[in-house]
Regions:
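Non-catalytic beta-strand/loop surface segments
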Residues: 1-40, 66-113, 124-174
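Non-catalytic, conformational "gating/processing" segments within enzyme and secreted inhibitor domains
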Residues: 27-63
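Short amphipathic alpha-helices in soluble, non-transmembrane regions
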Residues: 58-64, 176-182
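Zinc-dependent metallopeptidase catalytic helix centered on the HExxH motif
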Residues: 115-117
Length: 182
């Protein structure tokens, strides 16, 4: 969905770049990227399971305590995705995909927006579980889709909200789009 939703912003690219980007990167490019982003103030340590807290604290101090954050700030993305003047369509074909799928996306707020909670409630009502409105309508009543879902990209900058339907055998993309838009 990101590729279709973002023309300018890096959200529209894979996290590590395309194969072409990776193949074109020099050793100096990789070292510079590592120095810029792989640093203590841009990392998160996650520990789960049954462990001894004192032992964990000792290991964290031993292995991570000596690491020093650089004095320079982390470069942040400042690109702004312009509003789309017209709806966009993207068709993707892939091998071994037994059923067609359709997706419709809308701009979504940034994570800092007070509207995020309302979007999360909307998402739960529309598509969470077999009692959700989309599931009831598209899967049970219309028998149009085998599965429905959503992708909510709530990020640091404005993201996207997408509704997805994997269509039932014999159903057309046009039928799927019409039902998602209803």
């Amino acid at each position: 969905s990101s590729q279709a939703n973002f023309d300018v912003h890096p959200y529209g690219r894979p996290g590590i770049g395309s194969i072409e980007d990776l193949n074109a990167a020099t050793l100096d490019d990789v070292k510079a990227f590592h120095a810029a982003y792989y640093r203590p103030d841009n990392a998160v340590l996650v520990v789960s399971g049954n462990f001894d807290q004192k032992q964990l604290d000792a290991w964290v101090d031993k292995y991570f305590g000596p690491l020093v954050s650089p004095k320079r700030p982390i470069a942040r993305v400042t690109a702004v995705e312009p509003a789309h003047a017209a709806p966009k369509s993207l068709t993707v074909y892939a091998p071994n995909v037994p059923l067609p799928a359709v997706m419709i996306s809308w701009p979504a707020p940034a994570a800092s927006s007070p509207d995020v909670a309302a979007w999360q409630i909307l998402d739960a009502i529309l598509q969470r579980g077999q009692s959700s409105r989309l599931y009831q309508s598209l899967v049970y009543e219309q028998k149009l889709a085998a599965q429905v879902g959503s992708i909510m990209e709530i990020r640091q900058q404005p993201g996207a909200y997408s509704l997805v339907a994997i269509l039932s055998n014999g159903k057309s993309v046009d039928e799927g789009l019409k039902s998602l838009q209803a």
